[in-house]
UniProtKB/Swiss-Prot annotation:
GO terms for molecular function: metal ion binding; phospho-N-acetylmuramoyl-pentapeptide-transferase activity; UDP-N-acetylmuramoyl-L-alanyl-D-glutamyl-meso-2,6-diaminopimelyl-D-alanyl-D-alanine:undecaprenyl-phosphate transferase activity. Belongs to the glycosyltransferase 4 family. MraY subfamily. HAMAP family: MraY. It is a multi-pass membrane protein. The chain crosses the membrane at residues 25-45, 73-93, 97-117, 134-154, 168-188, 200-220, 240-260, 264-284, 289-309, 338-358. Its EC number is 2.7.8.13. Its cofactor is Mg(2+). This is Phospho-N-acetylmuramoyl-pentapeptide-transferase. NCBIfam families: mraY.
Amino acid sequence: MLLWLADWLGEYVRAFNVFNYVTLRAVLASLTALGIGLALGPWVIRKLAELKVGQAVRTDGPQTHLVKTGTPTMGGTLILLSIGITTLLWADLTNKYVWLLLAVLFGTGAIGFYDDWRKVVYKDPKGISARAKMFWQSAIAIFAGIYLISTASLPAATELIVPFFKHVIYPFGVVGFCILTYFVIVGTSNAVNLTDGLDGLAAMPVVMVSAALAVFAYVAGNSVFASYLSLPHIPGAHEVAVFCAAMAGACLAFLWFNAYPAQVFMGDVGALALGAALGTVAVIVRQEIVLFVMGGLFVMEALSVMIQVASFKLTGKRVFRMAPLHHHFELKGWKETQVVVRFWIITMMLVLAGLSTLKLR
């Protein structure tokens, strides 16, 4: 929106042409989302408290979590609001990827919102059925896959890129691409949701991963940089960097209120949406494997649940004291803040490893 205004003003004052630079708009998007989140945060938390949208805590979990009962949840609405407003302000609204990302973000956010609402109304920590949640997540992911492959302008936009190796690619057909897109988007969405179990645990990793994906998006959208770094050139992908920057800024603002002891929880409305958005960005810029590396924390959390369930069904025994993984370490004696900060450090190392694939090929 502001880009259109800047283009018009640029005809009279050349200084406004500076807003054509994606890097500047990405920085401004991050700051804008951060500002909106910090400004609206107290009001949103107050309204959630007035609506008695309190978190229902599992009684079979760590007993230290019982004090969190009643803390306002659905704080992800603040994140989505900040991202939405900021993206509309600073992104190029003629870019197809911008609208796809907003559709995925708010589509999965709506699923999470309904899930959270059921938890609050019925005081049931389980929310809506897993089958219903998976159905709607799948519908959104398949839509994204079909849309991307039907609008792809170059073969590179649908090829799987293997990091650390030059020119090692695997072309996909329509079905293969949609299947990959499905697993990346739905998998990341649920993995982030599983990670969001401690104060600040999910927000900071999302900040780091989204900031790193912004770099990949900028490079993929620039033919010169993409060629130099042996990455696929995806026309228009540079605008995705603005969205990623907005996501990082919004989550950073949310962390201000979600840091221990949390004043508000993200809820499914935020976690499902952020995970799906990260997955969609990775698919757009053809960095699904790199997302698997940088989002290793999310992968570990999801795997811990799958391993726990499979082990219990097959052998009747549990591998972990409790799943997801962060609860396992809590029950081993780690304090909540120790788990969170140590998992942040792990994510930082994984993100740096992911960024290294830009050059190490």
